[in-house]
């Protein structure tokens, strides 16, 4: 495992270099990947997707290529770039995918020779279910408007004895900041420009998914949450909450569509030897993007180089705790990594 000093040196020495490079849209426009010329490029907050009618596997399954970036977003605002974030989350996702793919399914194709650190993900182009599937085991303190914590604070301020959250009737006095919930709660939210937490009944009534689809999604997610929780407990950590996205594949199966149990989509807290949550300055010792959210002081703030490097160190340290393995960075220029990985995928699948 890399020591704290080694991680700091890695980020300090290579941070600027690994953030350099073109977007996939620019690479395609420069005709660096001829097979993708004319394809649709969807640019997201932190990653981009590429697909087209002609981009299919040899047996006709539509392909979507997802390109992870180093961009970071909090409170629905882009805050800059974090060195190595793309590679860290790629390895984080790969590790978790191997734990839960038999339970949640996966849209990803396996490509021989593609490294776990590859920031290009080959996947089936699913019919997406327009819902963010959020599971919560603890009420983590959070500044995010859709969080259970913010809804609980509002209920307390209004003097309510109970409140409704995503279809759950909750006793205000039964909860405490960063405390464990009475049970694992499914708390879906919409996939809008500004997300909002909703009752599962809303999804069914508005045709987002069928009752059967939601039941499958909920049951599989509860099982996967348990699998990951058991793995982490053996490493002295606890899974606090997670957000996953799903879609329907060509075989009419509901499968995971995006990253699974990463530090961007989940919260992980460290445990003491007696199994209680470890605290520092009265707060849980956490491995998640919440650390970056806590650094935001105003709505339009951009992270400085020093802040970005500090966040990068936390990401790498978190990965090593989650996987129990040393972080192995790919130090090739970013453009080279993207082009070579994409060509390998296209040669293998199409």
Question: What is the predicted function of each stretch?
Answer:
Residues 273-321:
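C-lobe/activation-segment region of protein kinase-like
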Residues 3-41:
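Short, Gly/Pro- and small/polar-rich lid/capping loops
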Residues 178-211:
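A short mid-domain helix/strand-loop element embedded in enzyme catalytic domains
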Residues 209-240:
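A long amphipathic alpha-helix within ATP-dependent nucleotide-binding catalytic cores
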Residues 112-119, 232-249:
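A short glycine-rich, hydrophobically flanked beta-strand micro-motif that places a catalytic Asp/Glu
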Residues 240, 244-293:
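Catalytic activation segment of kinase domains across protein kinase-like and atypical kinase folds
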Residues 25-189, 300-350:
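Active-site loop/lid in soluble adenylation, ligation, and acyl-transfer enzymes
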């Amino acid at each position: 495992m890399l020591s704290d000093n080694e991680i700091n040196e890695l980020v300090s020495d290579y941070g600027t270099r690994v953030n350099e490079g073109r977007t996939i849209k620019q690479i395609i426009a420069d005709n660096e990947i001829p097979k993708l010329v004319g394809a649709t490029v969807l640019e997201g907050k932190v990653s981009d997707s590429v697909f087209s009618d002609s981009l299919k596997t040899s047996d006709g399954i539509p392909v979507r290529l997802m390109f992870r970036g180093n961009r970071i977003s909090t409170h629905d605002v882009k805050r800059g770039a974090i060195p190595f974030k793309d590679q860290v989350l790629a390895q984080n996702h790969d590790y978790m995918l191997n734990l839960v793919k038999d339970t949640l399914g996966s849209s990803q194709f396996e490509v021989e020779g593609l490294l776990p650190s590859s920031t290009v993900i080959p996947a089936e182009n699913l019919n997406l279910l327009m819902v963010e599937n959020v599971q919560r085991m603890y009420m983590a303190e959070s500044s995010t408007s859709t969080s259970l914590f913010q809804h609980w604070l509002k209920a307390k301020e209004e003097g309510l004895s109970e409140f409704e959250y995503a279809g759950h009737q909750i006793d205000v006095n039964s909860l405490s900041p960063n405390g464990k919930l009475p049970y694992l709660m499914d708390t879906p939210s919409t996939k809008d420009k500004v997300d909002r937490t909703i009752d599962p009944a809303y999804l069914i009534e508005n045709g987002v998914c069928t009752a059967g689809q939601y039941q499958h999604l909920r049951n599989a997610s509860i099982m996967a949450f348990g699998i990951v929780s058991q793995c982490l407990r053996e490493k002295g950590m606890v899974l606090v909450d997670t957000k996953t996205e799903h879609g329907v594949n060509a075989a009419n199966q509901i499968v995971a569509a995006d990253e699974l149990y990463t530090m961007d989509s989940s919260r992980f807290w460290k445990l003491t030897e007696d199994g209680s949550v470890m605290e520092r300055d009265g707060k849980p010792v956490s491995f998640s993007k919440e650390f970056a959210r806590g650094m935001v002081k105003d709505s339009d703030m951009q992270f400085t180089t020093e802040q970005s490097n500090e966040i990068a160190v936390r990401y790498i340290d978190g990965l090593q705790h989650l996987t129990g393995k040393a972080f192995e960075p790919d130090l090739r220029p970013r453009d080279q990594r993207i082009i070579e990985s994409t060509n390998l995928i296209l040669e293998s699948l199409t």
